Regions:
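Short, flexible, glycine-rich and Lys/Arg-enriched loop motifs at helix boundaries
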Residues: 20-30, 213-216
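Short inter-helical turns and helix N-cap capping residues of alpha-solenoid HEAT/ARM repeat scaffolds
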Residues: 23-28, 58-59, 90-94, 121-123, ...
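Amphipathic alpha-helical scaffolding segments comprising HEAT/armadillo-like alpha-solenoid repeats
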Residues: 6-22, 44-56, 75-88, 107-119, ...
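Structural detector for internal amphipathic alpha-helices that build alpha-solenoid repeat scaffolds
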Residues: 1-8, 29-44, 53, 63-75, ...
Length: 406
């Protein structure tokens, strides 16, 4: 796996030589799965024939990774594509990955086989098949069936549904994706990928409102799947913020609104020190809670502001989605501190991601107490931003400010 950090002919040849070695040992088979994946990620097109041979393996996971790699490498070898078409008839294989690959490679010969899988009992296979038909035939009439998968009990099926809509470039269903009970990072990726080819002139207020909704991430905007039979304890709700199922997290976040800040703060403070500070899921939801109310106990508010400021400039990748949430929380709890520290959390030294800059623009726009000329001056700095969505958001904000100034 570390060879991905050393791209080049020598690395690719080492991996190809390794794949050519016959061995039935489990450790070797596992390593071959990774080798195929790395070759795909490296874009090693000369490896296509060797990876194609891996489709004959009895190891279904090696076959799965080989199919994925062949899609990355844009395989057009008729014999290899023919083998993948035949694998569609083998129910022991990962049919979802096969369908995604054949659709991604625009293999028209796969249409009839894939069409039959649109009624599969497996939701992941069914959704991929519907998405593939939309891509191959430009027939989007069945995409609404994938939307139904966005609120099924199993989170993996929900995430698969989002990916299927991304693959089909289903822009009409962006509102449904935005409200799906999956990771906000995944929903945002869907928005950006589907709108990826848009020019800033075409990104209107309606599109930006979807981005705003994901970034603000109010649990009342989420189609929560779960529900409680009776109101759980505060301790239980806080623990649910660690769940790997985002529907449970959003349900807990919504339910915690009924708890007073006096009761909530000591429990949160203790849990933060013990676990939440190092759990990227709970870390994010703690930022949401910090920025959801202004009546924290005085000592709690001071501590929360310290945590928030540290989180804004935390460059560890796993805590990336917390940064914009922390900016919003800081703006809500202390607008003066927000203004005073804004140059620091937007400086090049902390490498502020696009969503942090976007959130800053949103916060500036909402500062009713700020002088309009100062607001216009600050927003103007974002007009040359490298990100198309930040530019579009700042342009809309500026036009609104100038209307008020006129």
């Amino acid at each position: 796996a570390h060879l991905i950090n050393f791209p080049g002919d020598r690395t690719e040849q080492i991996l190809l030589d390794f794949l050519s070695q016959p061995s039935g040992e489990q450790a070797v088979q596992i390593a071959k799965r990774k080798a195929v994946e790395v070759l795909g990620r490296l874009g090693a097109t000369q490896s296509v024939p060797v990876i194609g041979q891996c489709l004959e393996s009895d190891d279904i996971y090696l076959v799965e990774n080989s199919v994925w790699a062949l899609q990355q490498l844009k395989c057009c070898d008729p014999a290899i594509i023919g083998r993948m078409l035949s694998l569609l008839q083998d129910k022991s294989q990962n049919l979802r990955v096969l369908i995604q690959c054949l659709a991604g490679l625009k293999v028209q010969e796969s249409v009839e086989s894939i069409r039959l899988l649109q009624d599969s009992e497996n939701l992941g296979v069914r959704g991929a098949a519907i998405s593939a038909i939309a891509q191959l035939l430009n027939d989007k009439s069945n995409l609404g069936k994938i939307v139904e998968h966005l609120t099924v009990p199993n989170q993996m099926d929900r995430q698969s549904a989002v990916q299927d809509l991304i693959d089909a470039n289903a822009s009409d269903f962006l509102p449904a994706i935005v409200s799906a009970p999956v990771s906000p990072a995944f929903r945002m990726r869907a928005c950006r990928q589907i709108l990826n080819d848009s020019d800033s002139m075409l990104i209107d207020a309606n599109i930006l409102s979807l981005i705003d909704t994901v970034l603000c991430d109010d649990p009342s905007d989420i189609d929560i799947v779960h529900k409680y039979d009776q109101q759980p304890s505060v301790e239980f709700l806080l623990q649910d913020l660690f769940s790997t199922d985002f529907s449970r997290c959003y349900l807990a976040l919504m339910s915690l609104r009924q708890c007073s800040s006096e009761v909530l703060w000591p429990l949160m403070s203790d849990l933060w020190e013990r676990e939440a500070h190092n759990d990227y899921g709970a870390h994010y939801f703690f930022m949401r809670i910090f920025g959801s109310r202004s009546d924290w106990p005085q000592d709690g508010l001071r501590h929360a502001l310290e945590i928030i400021q540290e989180s804004i400039i935390n460059r560890r990748p796993q805590f990336r989605k917390s940064r914009a949430a922390a900016i919003q929380a800081l703006h809500f709890l202390s607008s003066d501190l927000f203004i005073n520290t804004m140059p620091d959390f937007l400086s090049e030294s902390v490498d502020a991601p696009w969503d942090c800059r976007y959130m800053t623009v949103m916060c500036i726009e909402n500062m009713a107490e700020m002088n309009l000329s100062l607001k216009e001056k600050i927003l103007s700095h974002f007009m040359d931003d490298s990100d198309v969505f930040v530019r579009a958001r700042s342009e809309i904000c500026l036009s609104r400010v100038r209307e008020l100034s006129a």
